[in-house]
Regions:
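Canonical Rossmann dinucleotide-binding motif of NAD(H)/NADP(H)-dependent dehydrogenases/reductases
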Residues: 27-62
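Short, flexible catalytic-loop segment of classical short-chain dehydrogenase/reductase
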Residues: 208, 212-223
């Protein structure tokens, strides 16, 4: 028996070396069906995740927010052979419910759901946080945080045992980040909601997590005042001395969506080259010393 085990192990190592690790781990998501809320273009984090899942064999449904986004999302979804491409305003109960009813008709059961939806009025991302409007607060938390609760409620009956739901968050949930303001509060609420959802759904074998990416140059992020400085600061502080790529984040999304994360729930998984773990880099301390 031991001989056979060793032989099998050596054979697997041979295959890995012969094929290369990318080919060796192909089809990790074969037979898995799921939906992604929030893909908007080919430069965003949600797309990076979708690409990794599709390349590993996943069958993905897509939603988009309104007619304007349909022109961007439809070609992406079609390139990934999507069976379902549907408009969905996550602030409307009936639209989220309708999406999952269509999922049930087409797929029956689901294995993963990705929540990549966030929004706050631009004026509430600028200036001082103390000047946040009540309307901006309600919009930011409704779209960016409560929508995860709504999505999970309608997804729950369709999720297979051992399935995964995860949402995108950011370090601004636990640290004050310039020009992030009310969105930081929304992401903090999202992460807290995730933990309660993980407890609610865990007994049914459904995992719920958050994926916290470092700053990535996307169309959305470039609209944030001073974002280029955020990128430089993240590079300086990160132990790996670089920013994350869409591929980095996509691979982490693949981990959370696949059976590789079968024992992980209620967690915030950071993919930021270690930026969240460092108080300050040596370079930053030098700058401070010179300023004294």
């Amino acid at each position: 028996f031991l001989f056979l085990y060793c032989y099998e192990f050596i054979f697997l190592l041979f295959l890995k070396r012969r094929l290369g690790k990318e080919e060796f781990f192909m089809d990790l998501m074969k037979g898995k069906k799921g939906i992604i809320f929030g893909v908007s273009n080919t430069h965003g984090i949600a797309y990076g995740i979708a690409k990794q899942l599709f390349d590993e064999g996943a069958d993905i449904a897509f939603t988009y927010a309104g007619e304007a986004m349909e022109k961007r999302v439809k070609p992406i979804a079609e390139s990934m052979n999507a069976k379902l491409i549907m408009s969905c305003d996550v602030t409307k109960e009936e639209e989220v419910e309708a999406v999952f009813k269509e999922c049930e008709k087409i797929y029956g059961k689901l294995d993963f759901v990705v929540h990549a939806v966030a929004f706050a009025p631009k004026e509430d991302l600028m200036g001082r946080f103390v000047d946040t409007s009540k309307e901006g607060w309600d919009i930011a938390l409704g779209v960016s945080a409560y929508s995860l609760v709504r999505v999970c409620r309608h997804a729950e009956p369709l999720m297979n045992e051992g399935s995964s739901i995860f949402a995108l968050t950011y370090l601004g949930s636990v640290l004050s980040v310039p020009s992030y303001n009310v969105m930081g509060v929304a992401k903090a609420a999202l992460e807290s909601a995730m933990r309660f959802l993980a407890v609610d759904l865990g007994s049914k074998g459904i995992r719920v997590n958050c994926l916290s990416s470092g700053p990535v140059k996307t169309l959305a992020s470039m609209g944030i005042a001073g974002f280029s400085k955020m990128l430089k600061a993240a590079t300086m502080r990160a132990p790996m001395k670089r920013n994350v790529s869409l591929e980095d984040v996509g691979k982490a999304g693949l981990y959370l969506a696949s059976d590789l994360s079968s024992g992980t729930t209620g967690e915030v998984i950071y993919v930021d080259c270690g930026c969240h773990s460092a108080y300050a880099s040596a370079e930053e301390m030098d700058v401070i010393s010179k300023a004294e």
